[in-house]
Amino acid sequence: MGKYFSKDKSKYMLYTVSHPMDGYYWIRHADRGSVPLAILMVILFAVSFSANRLLASFVVNDIDPRAVDSLYELMGVLAFYLILCVSNWSVTCLMNGEGRMKDIAIAVGYGTVPITVMMTVSTIISQVIADDEQAFYGLLLGAGIVYGLIMILIGIMQVHNYTLGKTLLTLFITFIALLLSLIHISEPTRH
């Protein structure tokens, strides 16, 4: 357990957030990442997502807190994470990707860190902003989401040793595979 959540692994995750190109390269080539730590980051993302929906001020949040089921959202985020990783691995196996399943899981998991941080900060800030300051909330949340998506893009690109164009094509096909998987899972079985 200590080797997965060691101080070095945690520091390297933060290094990857601040230096994504170099960080993701060494995750693939020197086995520096940690899958359990990446899964923990996805769980923390799910918690911050639910907390934002439950606790953000009424100024920025029009969701009825009684309608939020945090456990259901946690399971949904974890299922989406699993299906995304499997879909990407399946597509990249056919497109000569060099990444392993664990590398993909780490790349996506570490990519959620900036989103989690900014979502938590936005939730806290939402408690003290006025109606005409909603743009600051949106800016913080948007910056975290954009940086997180850029990190995931860079992570997939580095893990599979792809060009930007091939990475974008692969991610497009991955999302088609993900949608097909979700449709198949949600469709009732016919006898």
Question: Model-derived features: where do they sit?
Answer:
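A short structural micro-motif
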Residues: 45-46, 176-178
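Selected alpha-helical membrane-embedding segments in polytopic membrane proteins
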Residues: 5-102
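Selective recognition of hydrophobic, aromatic-rich stretches within alpha-helical transmembrane segments
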Residues: 66-90, 106-177
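Residue-level detector of conserved catalytic or cofactor/ligand-binding positions
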Residues: 180-191
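Structural signal for membrane-spanning alpha-helices in multi-pass inner-membrane proteins
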Residues: 49-53, 119, 182
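Low-complexity, intrinsically disordered extramembrane tails and loops of integral membrane proteins
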Residues: 1-8, 187
